[in-house]
Regions:
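Gly/Pro/Ser/Thr-rich low-complexity, intrinsically disordered segments predominantly at protein N-termini
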Residues: 1-190
Length: 190
């Protein structure tokens, strides 16, 4: 009986990228992140996504500025969550408490997780990928993650203590002890 031989095609080795290398990547009109050393390229978000994210960022920013709570960062702001291999995530909205804002702010990606992260879902987001992002944020030290689903008119709240909550359109997102005094009815931003 002849011996069986499997054919294994020659594949290029997988190369990983670092956060510093990601800073030099320029792909026009694309959203890029680094996930465990692998470059992830996504299409830009649509109009509804942009409006929802901007409206929530505006309201959050007003509260943060009025009470000098810290800083709110817009989409495309990368945060280094892990090293070797590097993970750099860029949420739609991020908040850092005043005492955690780096001074001076680095030109690159800070090695810290925001206190609050907001992800606004787009039609091309896959549930498994979103949950992986949430897990990355929480394991890196984020206290509160809001995932806003404009299509379903609901939000999901994930906390660092492992608790979760669904927020219906007629209910409010609450900043809890992360953004004291902030509350926003979900339907007001949808």
């Amino acid at each position: 009986m002849p011996a069986e031989h499997a054919y294994v095609p020659s594949m290029p080795p997988v190369t990983t990228m670092t956060a510093d290398e990601l800073l030099r990547v320029q792909i026009p009109d694309k959203h890029v992140e680094l996930v465990r050393g692998v470059l992830v390229v996504r299409e830009p978000a649509g109009l509804r996504h942009g409006r929802v994210a901007m409206e929530l960022a505006r309201r959050l920013g007003n509260q943060v500025d009025a009470h000098r709570l810290g800083r709110v960062y817009a989409a495309e702001t990368g945060f280094t969550l892990a090293r070797e291999p590097d993970t750099v995530r860029a949420p739609d909205i991020a908040f850092l408490r005043r005492e955690r804002v780096p001074d001076p702010e680095p030109a690159g990606f800070p090695n810290l997780a925001p206190d609050l992260v907001v992800e606004v879902l787009s039609s091309n987001d896959r549930p498994g990928e979103v949950l992986t992002k949430v897990a990355d944020w929480l394991s890196a030290g984020t206290s509160l993650v809001w995932v806003i689903d404009p299509e379903r008119h609901l939000g999901r709240v994930y906390r660092d203590d492992g608790s979760e909550q669904i927020v219906a359109a007629d209910q409010s997102l609450d900043g809890e002890d992360v953004v004291p005094g902030f509350s926003c009815q979900l339907e007001a931003i949808l």
